[in-house]
Amino acid sequence: MSSQYSNVENLSPQTIRQVMRELQEMETTPPEGIKVLINESDVTDIQALIDGPAGTPYAAGIFRVKLTLNKDFPLTPPKAYFLTKIFHPNVAANGEICVNTLKKDWKPDLGIKHILLTIKCLLIVPNPESALNEEAGKMLLERYDDYSQRARMMTEIHAQPAKCGVGATGDAKDDGGPSTKKHAGLDKKLQDKKKEKLLKEKKRMLKRL
C-alpha cells in the first residue's frame, strides 16, 4: 500500500539520506519483533510489520503499521497508522495512533526505530487516559476481560499472517513470494476452521453489544 502523495521532494537530501541509512540498518539488524518494509522510491512512506507481544491480546498477530513523514521532518513528528485493523484504546477508527512520542514528547533526534519500538510498547501497555477509541479505553478500565476477548478476536480475524500476506516478521515476504505462498498453503485449512469459529463467536458478541 503506497501513500496517495509524497513529501519526498520537500525533504532535504540530508534528511533523505539519514532516513534511508536508518531504514537499511533496521533491515540488516532488525529490532526484536519488528521488520521494516523499505520503499526506496518514497522514503516518506515507511511501513513495518510488528509482532503482537506475548502475554497480550495481540499475541500471535502480525500488525502492519505506516509512518508518513511530512515536509518538516524531523523537526515535526511523522503521522503513524495501523494498516491492520486493531481494537486498541490509542488507535482511531482510521488507524491513526495516539502516543505522546509523536506529539508533545517528540524530539528531532528520536528516529524511526524509536517510533516503531514505542508503537510496539503501546501494544503491551495501552494508555486509556488518552484514548482515540473511547469504547476500547472504557472497556479496558472497567471490564478488562471483555476488552481482552474483543482485542484477541480482532487479532485472530485481521492480524494473521495470511491476512498480511506474510509468514512471520523474521522471514516476511511483502511481494507474495514462494515462502509466503507456501506458508499460506499450509495454513489454509486451519485458517478456514478458525474463521468459522471466530464468525460464530463474533455473532454472539455482537448480540450482547
Swiss-Prot record:
Catalytic residues in the record: 98 (glycyl thioester intermediate)
Disulfide-bonded cysteines: none
SUPFAM superfamilies: UBC-like
CDD domains according to UniProt: UBCc_UBE2S
Pathway: Protein modification; protein ubiquitination
Catalytic activity, reaction form: S-ubiquitinyl-[E1 ubiquitin-activating enzyme]-L-cysteine + [E2 ubiquitin-conjugating enzyme]-L-cysteine = [E1 ubiquitin-activating enzyme]-L-cysteine + S-ubiquitinyl-[E2 ubiquitin-conjugating enzyme]-L-cysteine
GO biological-process terms attached to the record: anaphase-promoting complex-dependent catabolic process; cell division; exit from mitosis; protein ubiquitination
SMART domains per UniProt: UBCc
Basic and acidic residues compositional bias, start-end: 184-199
Residue spans of biased composition, Basic residues class: 200-209
GO MF terms held by the record: ATP binding; ubiquitin conjugating enzyme activity
Lineage: superkingdom: Eukaryota
UniProt keywords, alphabetically: ATP-binding, Cell cycle, Cell division, Nucleotide-binding, Transferase, Ubl conjugation pathway
Region (Disordered): 165-209
Entry EC no(s): 2.3.2.23
UBC core domain boundaries: 14-160
Similarity comment: family membership: Belongs to the ubiquitin-conjugating enzyme family.
Function: Catalyzes the covalent attachment of ubiquitin to other proteins. Acts as an essential factor of the anaphase promoting complex/cyclosome (APC/C), a cell cycle-regulated ubiquitin ligase that controls progression through mitosis. Acts by specifically elongating polyubiquitin chains initiated by the E2 enzyme vih/UbcH10 on APC/C substrates, enhancing the degradation of APC/C substrates by the proteasome and promoting mitotic exit.
Name of the protein in question: Ubiquitin-conjugating enzyme E2 S
Organism: Drosophila sechellia
Lineage of source species: Eukaryota, Metazoa, Ecdysozoa, Arthropoda, Hexapoda
